[in-house]
């Protein structure tokens, strides 16, 4: 079986409404305020990131060795390598999965949602929802 070769990537972007393109797809970024929380589907909140916890600049990139993710649903922290293994994602495809980071911290991973450290809470004033629009170009 032949696998396509995928290369690591990193794209920096400002936090604002719009589309962020990276080599293997796109991310849709939408900004909301506290009053929008009641009107959103609970599933979307798995991809909601508190703006006060991230700053104005983020990166979308491929995973790096040692990246960790704190799952709010599972209440634990694991390396992305372990998460991808458990999800049975083929190794060559793992580099394509977008990881949004703030500095060295993992904020959001497609298919896994927002890290517990960056999720919205009762003090949230503004937040973004990240939606993966992946697909090979």
Give residue ranges: language-model regions:
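AMP-forming adenylation/ATP pyrophosphatase catalytic core
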Residues: 1-137
């Amino acid at each position: 079986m032949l696998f396509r070769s995928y290369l690591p990537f990193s794209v920096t972007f400002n936090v604002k409404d719009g589309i962020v393109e990276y080599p293997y797809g796109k991310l849709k970024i939408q900004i909301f305020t506290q009053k929008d929380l009641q009107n959103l589907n609970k599933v979307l909140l798995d991809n909601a990131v508190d703006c006060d916890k991230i700053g104005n600049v983020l990166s979308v990139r491929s995973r790096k060795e040692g990246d960790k993710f704190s799952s709010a649903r599972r209440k634990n922290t694991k390396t992305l390598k372990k998460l991808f293994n458990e999800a049975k994602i083929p190794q060559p495809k793992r580099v394509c999965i977008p990881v949004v980071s703030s500095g060295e911290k993992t904020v959001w991973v497609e298919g896994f949602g927002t890290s517990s450290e960056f999720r919205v809470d009762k003090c949230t004033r503004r937040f973004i929802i990240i939606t993966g629009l992946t697909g090979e170009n």
